[in-house]
């Protein structure tokens, strides 16, 4: 794979890749990156998103017919912090798709609520061990190498991880254990576990 060497090339390649990944994430004609994904103008008029709707948004719609999934996504995108996380999640999943890596194909067990709460409090090592993705060691190795070799990919991943950390702290304050279990199996949480493992974030 060619390494992206500039920000303009990054955005150009994203545009090409989105056409490939959006059918998989169901983020195609119904979500326009230039409008819906970047529109924060009405965020102050929006009611706070429920935990249930946020979790649904973090998983992205199941398919083009998932009107409820698109409803949740639009509500979450209108919120500044959650919208930033969703855009960052979309970006990293788009770049991962370049190497044929899709969150639906990832073999990973949902982590227990206690593990997420411990991580949000700053715990690392054995207490958050179930966040490590060990069943996909070849994928983890590929991503680790790309993090080392590709500056734009690394910056995009770090941007996503920072937003995830911030949103997780708030989610853990509001979510029940059953809600955190559902959250753990979302595409966004799967991406976090994969990228966190590859970057050594859980050590």
Residue ranges and their predicted role:
Residues 39-178, 182:
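Structured extramembrane domains adjacent to transmembrane segments
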Residues 18, 100, 168, 192, ...:
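A structural signal for well-ordered alpha-helices, especially hydrophobic packing surfaces
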Residues 32-42, 54, 58, 196-203:
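Cytosol-facing regions at membranes
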Residues 13, 17-20, 76, 92-95, ...:
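Generic, well-ordered alpha-helical scaffold segments in large soluble proteins
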């Amino acid at each position: 794979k060619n390494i992206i060497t500039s920000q303009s090339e990054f955005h150009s390649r994203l545009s090409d890749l989105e056409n490939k990944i959006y059918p998989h994430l169901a983020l195609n004609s119904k979500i326009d990156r230039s409008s819906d994904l970047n529109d924060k103008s009405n965020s102050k008029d929006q009611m706070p998103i429920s935990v249930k709707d946020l979790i649904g948004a973090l998983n992205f719609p199941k398919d083009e017919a998932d009107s409820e999934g698109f409803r949740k996504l639009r509500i979450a995108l209108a919120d500044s912090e959650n919208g930033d996380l969703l855009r960052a999640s979309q970006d990293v999943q788009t770049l991962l798709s370049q190497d044929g890596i899709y969150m639906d194909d990832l073999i990973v067990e949902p982590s227990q609520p206690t593990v997420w709460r411990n991580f949000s409090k700053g715990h690392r090592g054995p207490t958050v061990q179930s966040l490590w993705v060990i069943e996909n060691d070849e994928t983890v190795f590929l991503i680790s190498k790309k993090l080392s070799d590709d500056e734009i990919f690394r910056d995009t991943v770090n941007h996503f991880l920072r937003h995830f950390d911030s949103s997780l702290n708030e989610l853990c304050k509001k979510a029940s254990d059953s809600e955190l279990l559902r959250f753990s199996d979302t595409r966004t949480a799967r991406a976090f576990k994969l990228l966190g493992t590859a970057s050594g974030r859980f050590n």
